[in-house]
């Protein structure tokens, strides 16, 4: 990982520190269960350890079903994963596609995108810039679209402040 990406990774973990320390009300595994019309299982520290394999298994389907607090809990881990796998579009990396889709409008009610602090938003933008503008990124087109829709000044679908 480049020094710039490592700095963004650390910035994300710092910005989301409180969210990382909290137990998520809905896990990615729980979100995946909801996607299959099942009841979400309770959090289990051993099963829900956010390893690469866990993210690859549950993020793509599970992210859509997370409330704001649960979503923020996983964002820094997904940013870390995306920066480490920026040049890969292997099947397991659909976790990155899930991350990008979760950063797109429209926002929810209650909001997820608008629930971020300024520091958290800056960490997300820094990660998106890496995904959008790095020569080795296979996510450039999608990341640029996500940025245009919500994350840049004058974004297409972000309500004015």
Name what the model sees in each region.
Residues 1-62:
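Long, low-complexity, highly charged intrinsically disordered regions
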Residues 66, 71-161:
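Extended alpha-helical scaffolding segments
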